[in-house]
Amino acid sequence: MISRIWHGYTTFENADTYEKLLKEEIFVGIKNRNIKGYKGIQLLRRIVATETEFITIMWFDSLDSVKEFAGKDYENCVVPEKARKILSRFDNLSQHYEVKIEDHARDSM
């Protein structure tokens, strides 16, 4: 399994708007693409100094599945224009990790 991790940042004022956009449009759109090997996405949020940090963690069966999502240059970020207008800054590249151990205790959350 592959984990794709990406960071984006908003002002405090835009944080709720961005989270709503992710939940109601962007994540739904990703799911509706029916990407073979796509397993899901998590959203993390925290306040850091003068901004709000968001981290997305996506789960895929393989790098081929990641490439189906992000394209040949799969390390490049995938940030829709609507999100770019809300974000104050974001990582241009995503990080990819091979998942070596998975603890399913999170299923009880």
Located regions from the model:
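Exposed boundary/loop context
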Residues: M1, I30-R33, L44
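Glycine-rich beta-strand-turn "strand-cap" elements at beta-sheet edges
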Residues: K39-T52, V78-M109
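An amphipathic, aromatic/His-enriched active-site/gating alpha helix that lines ligand/cofactor pockets
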Residues: E24-G37, W59-H96
